[in-house]
Each structure stands twice: as structure tokens, then as C-alpha cells.
UniProtKB/Swiss-Prot annotation:
Name recorded for this polypeptide: Nucleoporin NUP42
Residue ranges of coiled coil: none
InterPro entries: Nucleoporin_NUP42 (IPR051767), Znf-CCCH_4 (IPR041367), Znf_CCCH (IPR000571)
Subcellular location, record wording: Nucleus, Nuclear pore complex; Nucleus membrane
A GO CC annotation given for this chain: nuclear membrane
PROSITE patterns: ZF_C3H1
Molecular function GO labels: zinc ion binding
UniProt subunit comment: Probable component of the nuclear pore complex (NPC). Interacts with nuclear export protein NXF1. Interacts with GLE1. Able to form a heterotrimer with NUP155 and GLE1 in vitro. Interacts with XPO1.
Function: Required for the export of mRNAs containing poly(A) tails from the nucleus into the cytoplasm.
Main location group: nucleus
Length: 423
């Protein structure tokens, strides 16, 4: 056996447990012999004390007799050298085998709840003072249900409603509806900022035991139950889903086709409005309750025959909630203005039978109600919304269209003439 050079220098930290030989020491040979509690010998720097300290660390029993992971922090932890503390007490308190296993968790739970409520109050203060978008949902904990009382409305949806009311010359109703939503948002924020006992209990119940939300289709919204219904944006809901106001329901949009509708990609309306199928002209309230009931026909983004809607007839707020399957059609106001279109984003011909086949209207809602038009005539519609004639353009706009690049600040807002397009 090799002689321990560290022992000769008086600084071997393993003592009797050393694998090398300690000449002149009792129990030389280290690890092959049992460690002695009080080894003797003429050691130069008192390695016996070091031996006792490190031997206790290396013993396997030291890991099992120390305080377990889940032990109470108030409990006195044994040191490395004292193993006479009750192991049974450690096992009970550490691994939760006592008579009341949740007794030691209640203080931590109270701290967590207090911290959660303080975080919610702080978030509400920041939300109110930062000027962030107010029509949004809120959840203080990741992968937990949203707190009730907030609606998720995108700026695009509000802008669409603005255009719908603008075409109907009823902007005051739009302003009243938006103001009502703002007031309800402020009231809910104030409730969460000044929490009372009942509000705290309801809030913690929403966070911990809230209804599990299904994964939304294509990232739109959730199936959370409605608790924040605005009278300014009513929902014509005849289904049993209890849809939230302004919510993108997961069972809409690209769901399976409903009975009486051979088209795919729809079973219920996208915004919770009732959908129906009729054989003649149908009238119904818009999906969000804006304006008056309108005479409906083919739906927006429709790539099927008029007997079936491809994207759901009440896909956006200003569009109707029912679907007309008969050949008789009545025009409604387009979503993006212009012409007497059949639906918000344009529609197909009254006798088109396949997707992308001979539409009778322009792409963005400028159409003439005709029974059959060729593809070329449908591109150059009577109203020419997609293209602007030369005589309606100013000299500056015409120069910009004829140049290779637009000049910053002088880009025309009108569509270009058809003659200048290279197709």
C-alpha cells in the first residue's frame, strides 16, 4: 500500500478512512478497516478531529437521518455530528405522515393567497394607469382560467363596428356602446383594486377552482362562461353554449357542418349569434346587436353556393346571423363600404355552384346583383371599386401610379387604374 503523502505533511483529511497507508498510526490502511471513534497516534497536527468531522459526512446514515425536504422550517435541524435526534419525528413531520398532514401548509397557503391578491391589486393599478388596451381578459396565474368580468375585444372588431355604424349613419349608438363597455371595465377594475371579504373569496375561487377552458380553435378566445354581458353589444344567442359577449367560441368558425347546411367550416356562429337556414329571404338581428335587423343573404368570405355558408354567416358583428338559401337576394351594407354588396366582404353570384367560380361581385363588397356573370366581367365590376378611372385621379396621383416608386407622403389612397396594372 502506498504511503499517504498528505499524512506525512500532517494534512490528510481522511484520517483512518484514507485509502493510503498512514505509517505509525493505529488502524493504518484507512478505508479497509472500521473507523475508530477515538484514534490515537503521534500525529503532528491533530488529524483525529478532522477524521471525526469528515467521517460523519461520508457515512450513509447521515443522509437518511438529516431533516427531510418537506420538514418544518421551525423544527430544529440536527447537525452533521449529532445523530441521536429522533428519526421517527423527522419522518412524520417531513413526509406528511402525521395525523394532520395539511397543518404545516396552512401558513404557506395564507402567504400565497395574500401575495396573489396583492399582485392582482397591483396589476389593476398598472393596467389603469398605463393606458394599455382595456378590452382584454386577465389572469394572474399562468394556465389558469381568466378572472370574470372582462371581455376580449380587439381593435379590429371595434373598427369594423365603427364602419358598420358609419354606413348606417348611427355613430351615436356606437359611441354609447363603447362608453358603456368602458364604464363596466372601470367598475370591475375598481372592484379588484378595493377587495372586500366576499370579493376575495370569489376571486380565489375563480383562480383555483375555475372552469377549465378548452383550447381555442386557431387561437381565438375561449369557452369561458359569460359573466360580463354588455347591453351595448347584445348577443343574439339561441344556443345552449352560454357564449360570452364578443367571444370567439371554439365550437364555431371551422367546426363541422350543421344539419340543413351542406357547407363545411361552420356549425354555430363565430360570435355566439344564432344561425339558421331558410329557403327565402331571412331577417335577423346582427351578431352584436348593432343597428336594425337586415335582410340577409350569402355570408362574408363565402366560397360556396348561396345555399351554404363557408365561414359562418354571422362571422363579424355587423353581418347577419341567418343564411338565405333561396335565389331571391336583397343587398346589405358592406363592411368596408362601397356599392350595394350582398355581404360584408363581397359575395358570390346567385347561381354559382363551386368555390371561386364566376363570382358576381368584387372582392371587397362592391357588386351588382346579377344571376350570372363571367369571371372577367366580375373583376371589372360596374362600380369599379377595385380600380379608379383615369378621369377621377388627380395629376399628382396619376404621376405616382405611373412612376416606378411611390414618393413618401404622396402615396395615393385610391386604387390604381386598371390600365396601369401589369397582370
Amino acid at each position: 500500500m502506498a504511503i499517504c503523502q498528505f499524512f506525512l505533511q500532517g494534512r490528510c483529511r481522511f484520517g483512518d478512512r484514507c485509502w493510503n497507508e498512514h505509517p505509525g498510526a493505529r488502524g493504518a490502511g484507512g478505508g479497509r478497516q472500521q473507523p475508530q471513534l477515538q484514534p490515537s497516534g503521534n500525529n503532528r497536527r491533530g488529524w483525529n478531529t478532522t477524521s471525526q468531522r469528515y467521517s460523519n459526512v461520508i457515512q450513509s446514515s447521515s443522509f437518511s437521518k438529516s431533516t427531510p425536504w418537506g420538514g418544518s422550517r421551525d423544527q430544529e435541524k440536527p447537525s452533521f455530528g449529532s445523530f441521536d435526534s429522533g428519526a421517527s419525528t423527522n419522518r412524520k413531520e417531513g413526509f406528511g405522515l402525521s395525523e394532520n398532514p395539511f397543518a404545516s401548509l396552512s401558513p404557506d397557503e395564507q402567504k400565497d393567497e395574500k401575495k396573489l391578491l396583492e399582485g392582482i391589486v397591483k396589476d389593476m393599478e398598472v393596467w389603469e394607469s398605463s393606458g394599455q388596451w382595456m378590452f382584454s381578459v386577465y389572469s394572474p396565474v399562468k394556465k389558469k382560467p381568466n378572472i370574470s368580468g372582462f371581455t376580449d375585444i380587439s381593435p379590429e372588431e371595434l373598427r369594423l363596428e365603427y364602419h358598420n355604424f358609419l354606413t348606417s349613419n348611427n355613430l351615436q349608438s356606437y359611441l354609447n356602446s363603447v362608453q358603456r363597455l368602458i364604464n363596466q371595465w372601470r367598475n370591475r377594475v375598481n372592484e379588484l383594486k378595493s377587495l372586500n371579504i366576499s370579493t376575495k373569496v370569489a376571486l380565489l375561487s375563480d383562480v383555483k377552482d375555475g372552469v377549465n377552458q378548452a383550447a381555442p380553435a386557431f387561437g381565438f378566445g375561449s369557452s369561458q362562461a359569460a359573466t360580463f354581458v354588455s347591453p351595448g353589444f347584445p348577443v343574439n344567442n339561441s344556443s345552449s353554449d352560454n357564449a360570452q359577449n364578443f367571444s370567439f367560441k371554439t365550437n364555431s368558425g371551422f367546426a363541422a357542418a350543421s344539419s340543413g347546411s351542406p357547407a363545411g367550416f361552420r356549425s354555430s356562429p363565430a360570435f355566439g349569434a344564432a344561425a339558421s337556414t331558410s329557403s327565402a329571404i331571412s331577417t335577423s338581428a346582427p351578431a352584436f346587436g348593432f343597428g336594425k335587423p337586415e335582410v340577409t343573404s350569402a355570408a362574408s368570405f363565402s366560397f360556396k353556393s348561396p345555399a351554404a355558408s363557408s365561414f359562418g354567416s354571422p362571422g363579424f358583428s355587423g353581418l347577419p346571423a341567418s343564411l338565405a338559401t333561396g335565389p331571391v337576394r336583397a343587398p346589405v351594407a358592406p363592411a368596408f363600404g362601397g356599392g350595394s354588396s350582398v355581404a360584408g366582404f363581397g359575395s358570390l353570384g346567385s347561381h354559382s355552384h363551386a368555390a371561386f367560380s364566376k363570382p358576381s361581385s368584387d372582392t371587397f363588397g362592391n357588386s351588382s346583383i346579377s344571376t350570372s356573370l363571367s369571371a372577367s366581367s366580375s373583376i371589372i365590376a360596374t362600380d369599379n371599386v377595385l380600380f379608379t378611372p383615369r378621369d377621377k385621379l388627380t395629376v399628382e396621383e396619376l404621376e405616382q401610379f405611373q412612376s416606378k416608386k411611390f414618393t413618401l407622403g404622396k402615396i395615393p389612397l385610391k386604387p390604381p387604374p386598371l390600365e396601369l396594372l401589369n397582370i
